[in-house]
Amino acid sequence: VHQETIMSVIIQVDRAQIGKKTIAEWLRRRDADLATRALAAKADVRLLDLTAPLPDTDRIEILTFDDEAGREVYRHSASHVMADAVKRLFPDAKLAIGPAIEEGFYYDFDLSHNFVPEDLERIEAEMRRIIAEDLSFQREEIERDVAVEFFKQRGEDYKVELLGDIADDRVSLYRDGEFVDLCRGPHLPSAGRIGAFKLLSVAGAYWRGDEHRPMLQRIYGTSFPTQEQLDEFLRLREQAALRDHRRLGKELDL
């Protein structure tokens, strides 16, 4: 299921406002309609949260769900909400990685319990609660060594390993409520911006793709601003799966 890439909106910056307002505050005054659709921003090559101060730049690119970078931010935030829900329901789960991918997102977990379809329904219900709470995504930049100690205390071994590969002295974390993750960002202003979502499947995945490392459980999902968009995606996905099934049947002469 392919989604067309549309150019995002570029706006000239009033230099008198630089550093005095957040990007979201500035945008609400410039274009109230666009502000309701904005997910994040880009200045030069930097991706920024809407809660960041208006940067020192001449032009700023506003990312919405209509462009690829905006969809990535949207779905990355959805992956954090899913991971938050999993940690609430399964506190022993260890967090690995959870990126946005072309048509959705996934998150890898290390957990002795094997996820079953009923678990996905429970996780979805918890995600709906988190979205209803409208928890804000808060960026925090700290010393790398402090982050290592923080995640060690939480028993998050995979995050500690990832931090060992980061050369920078400072790293960024994102919080929503009690949930904290190591992440470059950016993210949506809050979880309440996520409109519709669906957890699609569970698969096994070796940590870092190495068969000698632990086998993790990967939950795949997708998210859209509206239920109509999600329903259309699921309909097209089902049609594609049916075509593949029929083609395979012909190839195997079934």
Question: Each predicted region: which residue ranges?
Answer:
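Auxiliary tRNA-acceptor-end handling modules of aminoacyl-tRNA synthetases
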Residues: 37, 52-73, 82-85, 94-98, ...
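Short, basic/aromatic beta-hairpin or loop at an interaction surface
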Residues: 31-41, 80
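Short strand-turn-strand beta-turns centered on an Asx-Gly dipeptide
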Residues: 12-15, 42-45, 110
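Short acidic beta-strand-loop surface patches of small beta-rich interaction domains
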Residues: 38-52
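Short, contiguous acidic and Ser/Thr-rich linear segments
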Residues: 10-22
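Short amphipathic alpha-helical face segments that pack within enzyme cores
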Residues: 22-26, 77-85
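Short, Lys/Arg-enriched N-terminal segments with co-localized hydrophobic residues
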Residues: 1-6
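Short amphipathic, charge-patterned alpha-helical segments
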Residues: 19-33
